Swiss-Prot record:
<feature type="region of interest" description="Disordered">
    <location>
        <begin position="388"/>
        <end position="436"/>
    </location>
</feature>
<comment type="similarity">
    <text>Belongs to the LDB19 family.</text>
</comment>
<dbReference type="GO" id="GO:0005886">
    <property type="term" value="C:plasma membrane"/>
</dbReference>
<keyword id="KW-0131">Cell cycle</keyword>
<keyword id="KW-1017">Isopeptide bond</keyword>
<dbReference type="InterPro" id="IPR014752">
    <property type="entry name" value="Arrestin-like_C"/>
</dbReference>
<protein>
    <recommendedName>
        <fullName>Protein LDB19</fullName>
    </recommendedName>
</protein>
<keyword id="KW-0597">Phosphoprotein</keyword>
<feature type="modified residue" description="Phosphothreonine">
    <location>
        <position position="93"/>
    </location>
</feature>
<keyword id="KW-0963">Cytoplasm</keyword>
<dbReference type="GO" id="GO:0071230">
    <property type="term" value="P:cellular response to amino acid stimulus"/>
</dbReference>
<dbReference type="GO" id="GO:0005737">
    <property type="term" value="C:cytoplasm"/>
</dbReference>
<keyword id="KW-0333">Golgi apparatus</keyword>
<dbReference type="GO" id="GO:0033554">
    <property type="term" value="P:cellular response to stress"/>
</dbReference>
<feature type="cross-link" description="Glycyl lysine isopeptide (Lys-Gly) (interchain with G-Cter in ubiquitin)">
    <location>
        <position position="486"/>
    </location>
</feature>
<dbReference type="GO" id="GO:0031625">
    <property type="term" value="F:ubiquitin protein ligase binding"/>
</dbReference>
<dbReference type="InterPro" id="IPR050357">
    <property type="entry name" value="Arrestin_domain-protein"/>
</dbReference>
Amino acid sequence: MAFSRLTSTHQSNHNGYSNSNKKGQSLPLTLSIDVESPPCVLYGSAMESSGAVLSGLFTVTVVDPYSSAEDKSLKNTESNVSTTSKSLKRKSTFGSALSSRLSSLSASTSNISPSTSSTSISHSPTPANLRIMAGYTKITITSVTLSLVQKIHFHKPFVPNISSMQTCMNCKTKITNMKSWEIQSNTQDLSVGSHSYPFSYLIPGSVPCSSSLGATAETQVKYELIAVVTYIDPHRNSFSSGHSTPRKEGSSSKKRLLQLAMPIAVTRSIPRGPDKNSLRVFPPTELTAAAVLPNVVYPKSTFPLEMKLDGVSSGDRRWRMRKLSWRIEETTRVKAHACPVHKHELRQLEEQVKIKESEKSKKPRSHIKRYGELGPQIRVAVNSLENMPSQRLPGEPGREQAPNSSGPASTGNVGLDDENPVNEDEEDQPGSEFIHPSDDALRQELLMQQQRARQQQLQQELKNNSSLFTEEVRIISKGEMKSGWKTDFDNNGKIELVTEIDCMGLNSGVSNPVMHASTLQTPSTGNKKPSINVACDIQDPNLGLYVSHILAVEIVVAEETLQYANGQPIRKPNSKNKKETNNNTMNVHNPDQRLAELSPIFANRNTPKVRRMGPEDITPVNSNKSNHSTNKEKASNGASNSNIVSVPTGAARVLRMQFRLTVTERSGLGISWDEEVPPIYQDVELLSPPCYELSINNGIKNKLYSTMSTPVRSEDDFVGGSDEDIGNYESQGLEPGPNVQEVTITQNKLTIPPTAHHYQPASSSQRSLTTVQSPPLESVVSVQGSVPFRGHVLTPHSTRDIRIQNFSDFLDSNRITQ
């Protein structure tokens, strides 16, 4: 309510602002918003998205009253007067701008009446003089607020069919305040110049994206940044337009309101993943269809549909493909919204719809068959667990499935029997795990979880005092394919095809985001709205907005029978045994359809494993006889095949399939705000911490000095002493010299070394490797190299007995083990 009033005042102010420009007046304030963050893109679904960061700079500029266009014209008149009447011009020696303009005014009036130029200001003030005297150096600001709001505008057919609600603006608009910044709440004076205020907000990942819903695209979801500034007009507080005396503050102080609205485009992008593989079976026939589709679909693009039909040929009958047609359907469900004044009317309408639905449920359900071009199908229903839009778990049977048709049509009449697939998409929900057919416990647990989620969703929607939904189903794209597939009738037969699904005509209305907005910019009304005809997928139970898409594919197949050219059916000897063997082979080679419904993994689990032929299985034959026999067989087979023809029986079937499509926007870089790499130290110019190189070098140097495991002596001791003396000191238990610095030894637990190998030095001819174990570590003597940065690295200067568990870790260091 508050924002609607602000919008109305903003419109009135805007009209007043345009009128004031005509009168020669200008606003003392200008507002501008600059967005510094990348476009607001929500990566991932509503459940897993981390949101998007919106940050920018809000600037309030107090306009300098002496730098306007009128002052420039005043300066031009001053220059003209100075050239024509140089003797009458007064040269100003003051530094202030006011005195210079007063002097120019006196010079300008001297051109008109030179005799009274000295008394023109005091006796007869002009409008220019009054304007300059009414100048200001600061403005009193009472409040400055910035808000990010979500606006939902409802339009037909998503407005309830009640006349009072269709004319109420509060029922047709829903505004939600997402974030508000109280920049200034107390009265404060702002001087002439620009005053900037930074803002930042993390947009939640569960909010719906900016979109236009419905066939007319008038129902819109949009986001706006609204800046509101209230101030006291300084022009009214100084001088009146017709008098030279200043007004009183109590009578002249009037608050003005200035508002700026900037649209924020919020889009959702689901990253591209692996393609979806779906399997459909069509009992009572032996046809199975496997389809491959991308997991996401973008507007203004095309995507391939790969399909393979198996079980086309069986015995003396086979199916020949005639046509493939496809269409993309968009289903939009919007919850009814009403203001507090009309809530009782919405409840009455909801009760009426409940009564109608209960009466319809008693009657047998009849399927609507679509023929030709149909407009959007609109239905009003009350939300419940049965019709709640939600994503099913894999393996859950569909509730809306009708019983399959039985038997083909008669051979005399050409009938098209509809074949509905038994199972839906197994990967409707991205990231869903596969459930094994025998794992009933896991299946029941997942079903219970989904049931609880639906109950919570229904309770959450019932809290909103409305469960009335308007559903619109419309076709947004369609096409057909009449040729271009490959057919193979060998063995069980198969049909393979690849077709392009055209979505180039779909437009979601996404354009370049607005990065700057100001009150100085006039709103552009000449541009026409783009023809928006699709909306991306939305699942928002809080607002009651659901948008989903389905790819419906229909394949027409005609039945054919095989017979000889003379019209006689194909009959082979031992028909009974042959039928039994054919049935056995069919049961073996055909996939188990029940398991095929669950996963393609079990489709070919009964395929026989052919044993490889060994040399004992091959029997020698005469080459002449074999060639003669094979030639006879080839000739007989060729003759028989040439006499066999296929005759259409007149029966046909329509194989209908539905695949869920996820329509989303392109991801661009595809990097969310929480996955971006932070700036390195060198990018921070002011007060930057030390760079990585210096810190790493210092850390290595300190580590080298701290890990010394032997005493270090000074250079004087190296001159007078030797390594043997130092060894004697340690063996006798005597203390070393006074200049020797003792360093503590850090002993770490070392792992047991692997088996070592060495050559036998005695025999040079036999240089075979022999495995030996490591020697006892108590008697190992280590010779430490010299201290770094002192002479040579490998020059030994001290020896010492070190009791350690292992010596293999020292092989890669600068120590020499003996």
